[in-house]
Amino acid sequence: GILMLTFGGLTAWAQRSFGRVMACGLAVEIGALLIQAGLGTVLSIEAIAIGIGARAISFGLLALGVSLLRQEFGSDEFDALRGAGRRLVWAPLAIGIGGLSLAGLPGTIGFVSRWMSIRSLALGDQELMMLSILASASVGIAVVRGLGALLEASPTPTPEDAPATLEMEAASRLETLRQLIGDIWARLKARALHLSVIAPAVTIVWMGIAPHTLALLAQSIANGYTFYR
């Protein structure tokens, strides 16, 4: 138990992914539970009983947040997720509540079990009590580092990058305008071709029908005039 607690505490703060932070936090919690079981006191048994439920909730929330990040961005590395928390709000919220509860931050559900563990250790071994506190703080530091990467603001362009950005935007607009003009020109050509085919056909039909129609009209007018007369 002491080895697992020490290993998890020494390595947790330096991790650069949420998956490794969870692994180190799990090592710390298993080590703490084994130490409490070795004490064999009533207070340590109560700490184990409450701690199992608190740790299950904490790990569940932390795993939920990490799962959301992996599903959306395909990674849980801090460097790959910089600023991702501003686009996926629920992930940093779940990681913050679960991770800080796992570290035993006051005001979270994990603080109750952590406080009972510290009290039981304080009655027997002061060194183990300090080791447990430092290991929990190491997990908390790792979680805070990860949250800082998630909530990091998007980098603003430097003055040297600004002209390049403006040139790219202008080129994009010119390309859009060129495509629009090309589309209009293609439509006009298609309409002109359509009219060039229809107009001669209409002319031919009209030239064939018009004389006969005019003759019939003249005959009708003449007949009408004769009848009324």
Residue ranges and their predicted role:
Residues 85-91, 143-229:
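Cytoplasmic/organellar membrane-interface segments at the starts of transmembrane helices
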Residues 1-115, 119-151, 158, 162-163, ...:
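Hydrophobic transmembrane alpha-helices and their helix-loop junctions in integral membrane proteins
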